[in-house]
Amino acid sequence: MATTTSLLGLSKPAASDAADITVLNTNFDLIDAFLKGTGIGTTAKSIDSLDNATAFGLYNSNVGAPTSSYHACLVLPYNANYIVQIAYHSSTNPTVLCMRRKQHTDGWQPWEYVNPPMAAGVEYRTTERCDGKSVYRKRIVYTTTDIGTADSVSSINIPHGIASFGELVSATAHMGTYALPIMDSNGYMTLVNAVNSANITLRTNGVWGNERTWTIDLKYTKA
């Protein structure tokens, strides 16, 4: 007696049944329709919102996406309550990278960058964690003119504009081709001294004349 599969409803003839090409072709059509409906084996399937993309497959939408542009999104469900989405921008712009989010019992979590493009002044939530908290990244670019006094320690406070700054994970900085800390030929030192809830503090016992542009990359958690 013939039976059917539980997922696609494919017909499974009994060993005693005669071969039937119609049954075989129907099974092929069911498999093809299933793969097409989930974007597997073809182009990503268009959907009204990525918020509704919960079945395994490859989908495409600009609603519920990381940005207003269309994204190809791979959906990996563990079960009905735990789902992971990995989204890629559908354009050829190489600066837009992969993002990821998950849904648990409390709904969809925010999109997180795997490798953020690090445009100046933009805050990025990333997939990195520190002490179980989400790690954010931000690049601050700041220009100064004629700072410091020789043989006297001076401080430069650079506002970072980060709301709810929590714990500093790391801070790296450079000025042109010089990475901080910088020690010049006279032995004068410039370094990132501290990062608090409002400012990045550089300290120097040298003189930086003319216009200088400082670039600071921060990793941090939220309070």
Predicted regions, residues:
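Acidic surface patches and DE-rich sequence motifs
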Residues: 79, 89-91, 102-104, 129, ...
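Short, compact, well-ordered microdomains
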Residues: 97-107, 205-214
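Beta-strand-rich, repetitive solenoid scaffolds
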Residues: 11-13, 23-27, 87-90, 98-103, ...
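Glycine-rich, low-complexity segments
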Residues: 26-58, 103-137, 141, 164
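Surface-exposed, low-helix, low-complexity loop/repeat segments of extracellular attachment proteins
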Residues: 5, 10, 19, 56-64, ...
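Extracellular "spike/adhesin" assembly and maturation modules
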Residues: 1-36
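Extracellular attachment/recognition segments
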Residues: 65-67, 75-78, 134, 140-223
